[in-house]
């Protein structure tokens, strides 16, 4: 992705703008940036793709690994994730050790279906995984080799998603506590002493905990069991009392512990440990030794992982190679080192002498901050799937062991031993049900991109939202450049779910690194180093906006920096002392936050809403890039993967709506498929539009087609509208919005939504269901839109209740007489034996049928067991903007449309231009999101163009700003490095004049507006300008709902609730009080009985209405009967008495009700719902 396309100020030839087209169709933005950035924004999907590449060990990963090895980087993994697991589990030996089975060289065959076919067929996009399995008989030395199929392994698409059962899903990266050694200090509740604890947390296996209590004794807790003296453990590991005193004699805490310790020999110590860990079992020295070995010293049972060993080495000053075979388990040196660190900490020591790379150095002794990003790491996709495969293989290992003992040695082959079911099931379970495998958010390209870059502290092995306190959720200084401090959800997950910062990347150990420019002796170079949160603590780092001269040296002698050791306030230091400098001002924020212009003028809470609401923007019929952008729009759109990009340089040879063919410079030909009106996960239209014509030349990365919500390869989530900040007859009170009818009639804010409707024909006990046009008791005009198969034709306009697919289901009935059977055979009267179960358009929906997919078992389509045919209908509807829809800007300024005014009634400017939208000015000061006002002014400047006379002071910082432009410019004002207030004021004064020679808006940003109804001017000047407005997914059409008669709850017989259940409105407790207060007794009685759960009454009312009779008296509601039943279950005999004192019988005669129901054609038999939606 070329940096020069992001900002015009970095282009050498600054053409006078009029949207100069570059070779690849992207438009040039005029940028207000002043800071040179040595590094482009990296590939924003690398978090997902690189992790998965490592797991499967594909070509891209091998190239990257080779580069890293050539560059001398030792931290990079040299074996793929799958190879690691198979190596780890090999060899599987039987209980006697006579046979072994080992695995190597995992390989993938080609996928069965392409990604598009998988979406069509509801299949999983996966490739068959094969492994070389070797069976060895240790007695005879005989070896049998086979290549074994290990199941279908889901593959990641180019966009970083997975297609599982036909739907796109994303695996979210998890933020977890890193394995390693941790030290804590807590105040004792009973005394004023501090209690010190140490823990070694492994990647998997038993915890090892030490504690110095208020009596100054050092206790150890193995595997979360009872506490015992640490000296007992040391003796069990072979140390004598004199060795312990020699090593720890200077510490009172260890001396006190030794005095209390009653064991003298190693055997005693082992037995003592065994009694504590396995109370009730007879202790033996061998069993105790095995138990202890298995807990911490056996690689099969205990694994620190590379990262755990790295953290322990760093924390305790141990010099043990990460590559050594026993690096993943503890040894006596680790245990001694952690005890020494803890007792030093308790004694008030500040440092220890330790070794690193063979040299002595001072090790700082301090407690840990577990929320620091040096102690929290990322488990990305690759590692999450790897853990799942490991689980599956360990289950398979048990099966293999059992089969080794039961099968005949001669007949055994690897194939007969292996059962791949547990492995396949583990992978399926992870992708289908894990909390971290999520249905992809496809509202717009940004929503998908952000979803893939999400970091979640929830999920298996993570936190739970109920138990997470404030500390974990809080913004931490180590988040800088790693996790965005702004973008996080509102609500119970706040702070637990974050987003990776724009420049952040994950190192091989799972820690997030962020780039810094190297500084030496006050000179800032373009050399970039990536630092983890731990590394960063050792340096003095300046921020990106520290002023530099033309030679990249600091202008000022004193520079504002973040101190060594982190935390604390920024301080001023001499320029020569600075060691690193931020790469870019937007380094600390995520992609969505970096798309908010003038973010620096917005309150953080509103910026959070702005970042989150951009993800809810619906792609509009015609996309329009923002006139006031931040320069991040192109990177976001391209990396989201919804824009079609040239993979190789070449010339376009053929263009059609859904296919572009390019002849590449290397002689090959590439076909680029263009998606047309597909349905996204959220029901929005996923449509791509070709931008190139035949004969056009494109370089690598050139844009071939725009996707949804992109414009010329830039992210375009909304529309630039003319906004006035004023009150209008109180219609924009409390964030309500007034719109112009123009936006409705010209489809400015219209969007296309596509719904999918599905029906299948199954085998039932009474016979097969049939998809047919021959439906009983349905008139021909209703069937007019169906073809001969009974399926609606493409292009048909449908409304709620229309039949999309005709289907009949056999129903059981009494035996027919031979005469009836004969008549039926002659006249083909089916009505008696089948019922109509056709697929109809649900309530409140309508649109045009744009797609039909028909699957039939006879055509060899893969269908679920018992399903013979499956039909999918796609219905598209154009939703115009309407009252009740939600609009928002990019600064958290959201509102609901209250009134749509005719164009002639809208306020208008002096040149007659009516405004598009009227917002309430009171929405700005209290919310402190002033960025929207600056955007408004700059939007006006961009739309009108400018002509600068002379060289005023404010222009000197903008050498690349064109001095004269036409109308309709597009600008970039990057986050924390954007247009300043004096620049905006100066440009407002210099904007182009109207045909009459008037300057409509001067440096105040305000103008005189006229009332469209009277033509009179409003008394005060009003802020007017262009603002970028998004239409959010909260559309009133999806929410509005009405019910006539519908389903009732089984027990209370009251109507169900909610639109999905076609439910009623709840008339709750408080509403009842209101009617009681007004004395509206009859209205209330109706609501509580015949309109709700008086079963017989409601049928009789229906009958009375149909026959035109008076409404009958209400009966007893069902809920009252339920109440009486509940009281009877408590042994209280409750009777209902009439006013005369006679007992009222609670049973009504059902015959009458069923008679009335039959007459009126009401179906009282409660059909079992086919799906959750019908409940």
From Swiss-Prot:
Is Transcription among this UniProt entry's keywords?
A: yes
Single GO MF annotation: DNA binding
Which EC class is the enzyme in?
Answer: transferase
Residue ranges of the region described as Disordered: 1-24
**Could you say which EC number(s) this protein's record lists?**
2.7.7.6
The record ties this protein, via CDD domains, to:
RNA_pol_B_RPB2 (cd00653)
Q: Which domain of life is it from?
A: Bacteria
Q: Which UniProt keywords apply?
A: DNA-directed RNA polymerase, Nucleotidyltransferase, Transcription, Transferase
Gene3D superfamilies in the record: 2.40.50.100, 2.40.50.150, 3.90.1100.10, DNA-directed RNA polymerase, beta subunit, external 1 domain, DNA-directed RNA polymerase, subunit 2, domain 6, RNA polymerase alpha subunit dimerisation domain, RNA polymerase Rpb2, domain 2
One of the record's GO cellular component terms: DNA-directed RNA polymerase complex
Instruction: Please list the reactions this protein catalyses.
Output: RNA(n) + a ribonucleoside 5'-triphosphate = RNA(n+1) + diphosphate
User: Which stretch is the leader sequence?
Assistant: none
Q: Which SUPFAM superfamilies match?
A: beta and beta-prime subunits of DNA dependent RNA-polymerase
Task: Kindly state a single biological-process term from the GO annotations of this entry.
Answer: DNA-templated transcription
Stated family:
Belongs to the RNA polymerase beta chain family.
NCBIfam families to which the protein is assigned, alphabetical: PRK00405.1 (NF001616), rpoB (TIGR02013)
HAMAP family for this protein = RNApol_bact_RpoB
**Oligomer status and interactors:** The RNAP catalytic core consists of 2 alpha, 1 beta, 1 beta' and 1 omega subunit. When a sigma factor is associated with the core the holoenzyme is formed, which can initiate transcription.
The protein's matches in PANTHER family, at most eight in alphabetical order, are given as:
DNA-DIRECTED RNA POLYMERASE I SUBUNIT 2
Entry protein name: DNA-directed RNA polymerase subunit beta
Gene coding for it: rpoB
């Amino acid at each position: 992705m070329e940096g020069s396309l992001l900002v015009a100020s970095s282009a050498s030839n600054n053409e006078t703008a009029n949207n100069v087209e570059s070779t690849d169709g992207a438009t040039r933005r005029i940028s207000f940036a002043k800071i040179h950035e040595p590094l482009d924004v990296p590939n924003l999907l690398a978090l997902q793709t690189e992790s998965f590449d490592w797991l499967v060990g594909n070509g891209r990963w091998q190239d990257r690994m080779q580069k890293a090895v050539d560059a001398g980087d030792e931290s990079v993994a040299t074996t793929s994730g799958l190879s690691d697991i198979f190596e780890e589990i090999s060899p599987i030996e039987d209980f006697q050790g006579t046979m072994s089975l080992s695995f190597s060289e995992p390989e993938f065959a080609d996928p069965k279906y392409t990604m598009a076919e998988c979406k069509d067929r509801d299949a999983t996009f996966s490739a068959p995984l094969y492994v070389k399995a070797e069976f060895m008989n240790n007695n005879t030395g005989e070896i049998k080799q086979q290549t074994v199929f290990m199941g279908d392994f889901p593959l990641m698409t180019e966009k970083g998603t997975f297609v599982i059962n036909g739907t796109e899903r994303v695996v979210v990266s998890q933020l977890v506590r890193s394995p390693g050694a941790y030290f804590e200090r807590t105040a004792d509740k009973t005394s004023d002493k501090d209690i010190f604890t140490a823990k070694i947390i492994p990647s998997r296996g038993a915890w090892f905990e030490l504690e110095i209590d208020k009596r100054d004794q050092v206790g150890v807790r193995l595997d979360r069991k009872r506490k015992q003296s640490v000296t007992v453990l040391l003796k069990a590991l072979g140390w004598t009392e004199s060795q312990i005193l020699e090593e720890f004699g200077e510490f009172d805490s260890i001396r006190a512990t030794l005095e209390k310790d009653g064991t003298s020999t190693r055997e005693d110590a082992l037995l003592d440990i065994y009694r504590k860990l396995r109370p009730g079992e007879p202790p033996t020295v061998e069993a105790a030794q095995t138990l202890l070995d298995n807990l911490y010293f056996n690689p099969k049972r205990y694994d620190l992982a590379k990262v755990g060993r790295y953290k322990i080495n760093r924390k305790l000053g141990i010099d043990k190679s990460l590559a050594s075979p026993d690096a993943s388990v503890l040894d006596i040196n680790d245990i001694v080192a952690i005890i020494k660190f803890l007792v030093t900490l308790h004694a008030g020591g500040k440092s220890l002498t330790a070794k690193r790379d063979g040299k002595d150095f001072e090790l700082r002794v301090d407690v840990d901050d577990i929320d620091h990003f040096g102690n929290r790491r990322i488990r990305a996709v690759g590692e999450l799937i790897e853990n799942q495969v490991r689980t599956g293989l360990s289950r398979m290992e048990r099966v293999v062991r059992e089969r080794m003992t039961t099968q005949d040695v001669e007949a055994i082959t690897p194939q007969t031993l292996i059962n791949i079911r547990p492995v396949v099931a583990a992978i399926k379970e992870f992708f289908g049900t894990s909390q971290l495998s999520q249905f992809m958010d496809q509202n717009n390209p940004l929503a998908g991109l952000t979803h893939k870059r999400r970091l979640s502290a929830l999920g298996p092995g993570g936190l739970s939202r109920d138990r997470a306190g404030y500390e974990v959720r809080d913004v931490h200084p180590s988040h800088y450049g790693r996790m965005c401090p702004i973008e996080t959800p509102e609500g119970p997950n706040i702070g637990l779910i974050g987003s990776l910062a724009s420049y952040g990347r994950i190192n091989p150990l799972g820690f997030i690194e962020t780039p810094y420019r190297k500084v030496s002796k006050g000179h800032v170079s373009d050399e970039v180093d990536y630092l983890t949160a731990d590394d960063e603590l050792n340096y003095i780092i300046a921020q990106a906006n520290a002023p530099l001269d033309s030679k990249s040296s600091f202008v000022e002698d004193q520079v504002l920096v973040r101190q060594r050791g982190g935390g604390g306030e920024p301080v001023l230091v001499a320029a020569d002392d600075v060691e690193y400098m931020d790469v870019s001002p937007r380094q600390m924020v995520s992609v969505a936050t970096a798309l908010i212009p003038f973010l620096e003028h917005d309150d953080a809470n509103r910026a959070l809403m702005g970042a989150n609401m951009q993800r809810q923007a619906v792609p509009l019929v015609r996309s329009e890039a923002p006139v006031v952008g931040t320069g991040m729009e192109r990177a976001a759109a391209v990396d989201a993967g919804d824009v079609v990009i040239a993979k190789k340089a070449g010339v376009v040879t053929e263009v059609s709506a859904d296919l572009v063919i390019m002849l590449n410079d290397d002689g090959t030909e590439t076909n680029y498929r263009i998606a047309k009106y597909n349905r996204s996960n959220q029901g929005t239209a996923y449509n791509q539009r070709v931008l190139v014509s035949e004969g056009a030349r494109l370089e690598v990365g050139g844009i071939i087609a725009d996707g949804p919500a992109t414009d010329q390869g830039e992210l375009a989530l909304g529309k630039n509208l003319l906004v006035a900040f004023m009150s209008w007859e109180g219609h924009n009170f409390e964030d309500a919005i007034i719109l112009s009818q123009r936006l409705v009639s010209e489809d400015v804010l219209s969007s296309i939504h596509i719904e999918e409707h599905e029906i299948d024909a199954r085998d039932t006990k009474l016979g097969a269901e049939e998809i047919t046009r021959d439906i009983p008791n349905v008139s021909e005009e209703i069937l007019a839109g169906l073809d001969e198969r009974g399926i609606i034709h493409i292009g048909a306009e449908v409304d709620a209740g229309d039949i999309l697919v005709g289907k009949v289901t056999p129903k059981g009935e009494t035996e027919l007489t031979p005469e009836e059977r004969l008549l039926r055979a002659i006249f083909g009267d089916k009505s008696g034996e089948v019922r109509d179960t056709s697929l109809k358009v649900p309530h409140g929906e309508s649109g045009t049928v744009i797609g039909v997919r028909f699957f039939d078992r006879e055509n060899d389509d893969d269908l679920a067991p018992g399903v013979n045919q499956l039909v999918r209908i796609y219905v598209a509807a154009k939703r115009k903007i309407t009252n009740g829809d939600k609009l928002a800007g990019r600064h958290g300024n959201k509102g609901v449309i209250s009134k749509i005014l005719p164009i002639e009634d809208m306020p208008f400017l002096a040149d007659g231009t009516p405004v598009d939208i009227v917002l309430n000015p009171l929405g700005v000061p209290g919310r402190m999101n002033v960025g929207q006002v600056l955007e408004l002014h700059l939007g006006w400047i961009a739309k009108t163009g400018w002509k600068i006379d002379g060289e005023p002071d404010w222009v000197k910082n903008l050498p690349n700003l064109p001095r004269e432009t036409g109308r309709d410019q597009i600008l970039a004002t990057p986050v924390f490095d954007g247009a300043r207030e004096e620049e905006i004021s100066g440009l407002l004064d210099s904007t182009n004049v109207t045909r009459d020679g008037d300057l409509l808006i001067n440096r105040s940003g305000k103008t005189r507006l006229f009332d469209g109804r009277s033509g009179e001017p409003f008394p005060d000047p009003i802020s007017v300008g262009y603002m970028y407005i998004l239409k959010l997914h909260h559309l009133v059409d999806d929410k509005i709902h009405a019910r006539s008669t519908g389903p009732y709850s089984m027990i209370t017989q009251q109507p169900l609730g909610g639109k999905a259940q076609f439910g009623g409105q709840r008339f709750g407790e408080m509403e009842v009080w209101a009617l009681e207060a007004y004395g509206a007794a009859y209205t209330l009685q109706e609501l509580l009985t015949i309109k709700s759960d008086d079963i017989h009454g409601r049928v009789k009312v229906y009958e009375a209405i149909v026959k035109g009779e008076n409404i009958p008296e209400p009966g007893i509601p069902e809920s009252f009967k339920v109440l009486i039943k509940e009281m009877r279950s408590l042994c209280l005999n409750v009777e209902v008495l009439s006013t005369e004192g006679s007992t009222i019988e609670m049973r009504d005669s059902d015959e009458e009700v069923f008679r009335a129901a039959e007459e009126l054609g009401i179906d009282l038999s409660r059909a079992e719902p086919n799906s959750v939606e019908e409940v």
